[in-house]
Amino acid sequence: MGASASVLTGSKLDAWEQIRLKPGSKKKYRLKHLVWASRELERFACNPELLETAEGNEKLLQQLEPALKTGSDSLQSLWNAIVVLWCVHNRYKIGDTQQAIQKLKEVMGSRKSADAAKEDTSARQAGQNYPIVSNAQGQMVHQAISPRTLNAWVKAVEEKAFNPEIIPMFMALSEGAISYDINTMLNAIGGHQGALQVLKEVINEEAVEWDRTHPPPVGPLPPGQIREPTGSDIAGTTSTQQEQIHWTTRPNQPIPVGDIYRKWIVLGLNKMVKMYSPVSILDIKQGPKEPFRDYVDRFYKTLRAEQATQEVKNWMTETLLVQNANPDCKQILKSLGPGATLEEMMVACQGVGGPTHKARVLAEAMATAQQDLKGGYTAVFMQRGQNPIRKGTIKCFNCGKEGHIARNCRAPRKKGCWKCGQEGHQMKDCRNGKQFFRQILASGGHEARQLCAETSTPISPTDGGGSEGTGESGTERGPERALSVCLPQIPLWDRPIVTARVGGHLCEVLLDTGADDTVLNNIQLEGKWKPKMIGGIGGFIKVKEYDNVTVEIEGREVQGTVLVGPTPVNIIGRNILTGLGCTLNFPISPIAPVPVKLKPGMDGPKVKQWPLSKEKIEALTAICQEMEQEGKISRIGPENPYNTPIFAIKKKDGTKWRKLVDFRELNKRTQEFWEVQLGIPHPGGLKQKQSVTVLDVGDAYFSCPLDPDFRKYTAFTIPSVNNETPGIRYQYNVLPQGWKGSPAIFQSSMTKILDPFRRDNPELEICQYMDDLYVGSDLPLTEHRKRIELLREHLYQWGFTTPDKKHQKEPPFLWMGYELHPDKWTVQSIQLPNKDVWTVNDIQKLIGKLNWASQIYQGIRVRELCKLIRGTKSLTEVVPLSREAELELEENRERLKQPVHGVYYQPDKDLWVNIQKQGGEQWTYQIYQEEHKNLKTGKYTRQKASHTNDIRQLAEVIQKVSQESIIIWGKLPKFKLPVTRETWETWWADYWQATWIPEWEFVSTPPLIKLWYRLESEPIMGAETYYVDGAANRETKLGKAGYVTEQGKQKIIKLDETTNQKAELMAILLALQDSKETVNIVTDSQYALGVISSQPTQSESPIVQQIIEELTKKEQVYLTWVPAHKGIGGNEKIDKLVSKDIRRVLFLEGIDQAQEDHEKYHSNWKALASEFGLPPVVAKEIIASCPKCHIKGEAIHGQVDCSPEVWQIDCTHMEGKIIIVAVHVASGFIEAEVIPAETGQETAYFLLKLAARWPVKVIHTDNGPNFTSTTMKAACWWANIQHEFGIPYNPQSQGVVEAMNKELKSIIQQVRDQAEHLRTAVQMAVFVHNFKRKGGIGGYTAGERIIDILASQIQTTELQKQILKXHKFRVYYRDSRDPIWKGPAQLLWKGEGAVVIQDKGDIKVVPRRKAKIIREYGKQMAGTDSMASGQTESE
């Protein structure tokens, strides 16, 4: 008592005894109250010595205050006494307990206000990274952003990757910044172009909204007054630093442009965070054993990513935080009341539910409880094993001793299998007759997934999946077999709460394997009880202990000890669960099967099994029995009608057999899959790492379950010799080898499994391709290998094993056909075979090896070898090696003798590419960062066009290398090319649309390539002009080619087995052969012009090769094109000469010939109508469908869709403004206007205006964010417009609108001085282009052309309706000399005075007065001058 009484002495003790317990009460505090308080504090595990000082009292009050709302009256009295004692220590004059409590609230409130004010002041002083400061002259100047702040921002973006943390990080770093500083921060993260584009859209939309709500004042500004900021001024694009400072700091109505801009950025960041972190706040729930602190961290991290107002976020915090907590924490949080702060919640829920908290409370209870209760605890613990129902003994799988299980074993963990003792596998994989012990239930010996036939749990690869049990387990249990046929399974996805009957009372209980005792609340049990105190959630509780209480759960009864007391949750502990025979089961391979279906309308394969030899049958039987034991396949009965044939081949060693299944028929019928990994990783793209490990996943496919509904389609049959017994039928439970879906499903499953490990171990670089894993890191070797073991354990938990024999720890590492060393890599050793006789299959394998070696060995060539196997040949056909192929093969052998190595990628250095031409149209290239240290090499021999030249092939090589670089390293290299800038630009000026190439700088490296001849761009003065032409008959293959000159010279030759194209080229060859050193050649063939004008230097066509040889002999050649049938003298003359006796024309039946003729000559509609006897509207439609007769500026090679209702739309920029341009592809008609922002809303509004003026069915745009926005999709859906996008790397797909952009800008520059605003100049330029500039076929303007095209389309549509209608009629007619009616004939055309009919293959023209037209209603009789039906001709 002396220690307790020493809390107060002297005057303080006198003051203590003067304070009343309650206002107006006669009772006062005495010394005994201090003694009582000291003992109570010991009960709550608090130090009584803290009562001696005011600071100690404050600590006690802070510790006890959270429990007041749920505490007992005794706790409230203790807290009141400590409050009074605190006032006495501080010498506050109080009269009773109520005044003491009031005094405490006042003091604590004033402290909080002072602390908050202090924090606010310090935050204002230290929070602004870029304050606007006043200089010595009193002017407000800007303090520039510091590199340290900028570096912190860049590092945050790279590490957080737009997670919710990036928003408070941005707000902290940009505190006090103006728009200029914020734009500097955004420019520093320019590598994230996709995210910045989203941010740009938000800024544009907010700027437009600002301009709408803050219109500029009308009229000029007063002198000396600075304008009000617009939306673009706030964004910093059209304002200066001084203006931003003035708007922020001006005394009258300041506008904090920096803060406004920060709000816009935060809106954009919220949008990006939502994209990068798509988890909803509703999905954040606390796990059963998750600490409350971790749950709160996840909750607020996701809350920051929610795009909601602050009021909504406050509501989420008040409701969802409590609602989604686990039941243990939720019970405590609800007891705190609705006004609890986050601090109070975290203090109250600290350690709740975790095993650490329970262990600490239990230890304190055992240390402080009275001695007579210790026996009670001992009795509780000794209750295990005393249950009369429990049979058998517990045996440890680790040490082999009885009395405990392996989890509680104190002996060292035994390596290897717990059953047979061998290393290399675990007990679950042991094949010595028993299954994994975790899958055996204590009460029946059945596997966990075989307990109940109604379970829907997916079958693991190690489970047989059938319903047959082993005979061993059946005989071992005896009578209990009937009780365990179908035991209940309780999953742990949610809290395991069941209904139990305890002492005859029904109640909801929680099955808690972490609790020793069974504790219930609000239940009256019969019999004697004894008092007991146990440690629980929130402290100690007093309970009543009943013995031998009957507990019934799921139909099974057990008697045991039950405690009754004020527990928040009814708990069934291990003392009852053990008696019930309840066990925890861990299923292997929890991978969810991927749903798979057959193609619509198809059924499974039903292919008969072909005969097999006896040794193959025996081998397949043994293999399938082993697979069945491992659960990979299951036996099936005759109810499955499907079958796939199987066979067996010997492995490479020649001793073991391998089972193969012919899944070709099933693959045809299975749905299509998307390959989630389109290529293999390349070692040149790996970064050099200090530690490297290579792993291989064993039985990769057989570790992934197959969709249970699809398994029946994988059925196969093992036949018997001489059909002695029915065949044994099986189906697959796992992914089969050879099935088309196995690679995609395995890759997808493997990626999902590795994702959490990648997130938890960012230091590791994991490259995954199928079952091969490369793991590299810069960690020390010991730490790296620890991480590897964690990875192997992680994979093992999901059912994937990593065999030790394929676990490579030391270099060199064999991976994906490569050999990896610490500082270099190469391909694995390649041996080229020496053969006297080569087959097609041998050549194919040889070319594959050489192509594989070419990625690191320079100069590998295979062109001559590829020539050997051209055409359709059998794989076993013998191929003699040509002299060139033998020489090429020997050169490759010599190159492969010298070892060559590549190096690893260094991100901080630039990529360079060297390209060389090897001769024979073969190219090689090397990609490197340092000279003579190649990352990758390669070759190029493919020829996309039949006629090409070195410049065009070089462009194709650049394109190939660029795409490889983007795939492997994610960026473009710099090129060193064997060409001069002048040679390149000479060809590229006209052929810029032939292919895509990236931006690159010219570094010419010898030997240089060049153009061997050049076509002149203007006619050659004084040179003779040759008009050339050719014609061929498609049926007879006969043709003519020739030329005429303006001097009267002409030459015509006859051709056999030719085509129109060959005849046209032969005519040009004749002109070149017969002309002098300089010549002008005129052709009407677009095909011939396209071939020759691309200046090829080699060609697969013999005629083109001869033309190239003739061109190299000439000094100057001018080649041009004119349209056919335009009355051009020389062209018309040669056309008649070569067409004589060649062409044949039929009316209407000759539409195909007319289209072919137009593709060749591009004649106008009048010429087509005259030559082929077509109606004008039909001839005009042929013209309208030809892109070359309407489009100006299109690429020389390639065409675009020129249907009458197709438009191309694009955005271009001029004078800092955005111009949106729409071009009618078929006519070149333009619609354009200036838009305020390049957003989806503005683009969609422009599209709707366009659709309101013209018929628009299809639009073609690029992949810009404004065109791919949801607003644009909605506009296209509403207007029923099909939206097509451009092809990446192919600007020709947007060639029409790109050319029109250039022309429109040219016209704008011509009329710009006539307009004050750009938008006015744009409309003036559109008017000039559409109605003041003529050109093209017929000399139309674009406006006239679009009207003519649309009118012709309407006429053609009506004409087609008439033609289809006319085909429904039959005609009876008579000749002038024969009065007998003939027919019926088919009606082809009905004119004003005559009809065209077809009778028995002959086409005739009959006057209307001698023809009777009737509808075909079946067999009808025709009378003289009368119709067989009442239908008139007008119908």
UniProtKB/Swiss-Prot annotation:
**Organism in which the protein naturally occurs:** Human immunodeficiency virus type 1 group O (isolate ANT70) (HIV-1)
Q: Where is this region: Disordered?
A: 212-232, 455-480
Renumbered to this chain, motif Nuclear localization signal spans: 26-32
Name of encoding gene: gag-pol
- Kindly provide the name given to this protein in its UniProt entry: Gag-Pol polyprotein
Residues modified to Phosphotyrosine: 130
> One Gene Ontology cellular component annotation?
host cell plasma membrane
Where in the chain is the site Essential for RT p66/p51 heterodimerization? Answer: 986, 999
Region (RT 'primer grip') residue ranges read 813-821
Query: Residues annotated as region Interaction with membrane phosphatidylinositol 4,5-bisphosphate and RNA?
Result: 14-33
SMART domains documented for this protein = ZnF_C2HC (SM00343)
Annotated cofactor note: Binds 2 magnesium ions for reverse transcriptase polymerase activity. Binds 2 magnesium ions for ribonuclease H (RNase H) activity. Substrate-binding is a precondition for magnesium binding.
Compositional bias segments (type: Gly residues) = 463-472
Residues marked Cis/trans isomerization of proline peptide bond (site): 219-220
**Region of interest (Interaction with host CALM1), ranges:** 8-43
For binding Mg(2+) 2, which residues are annotated in this chain's numbering? 1029, 1064, 1084, 1135
Q: Which residues form the RNase H type-1 domain?
A: 1020-1143
Give residue numbers for sequence motif Nuclear export signal. 16-22
Annotated Reverse transcriptase domain ranges read 630-820
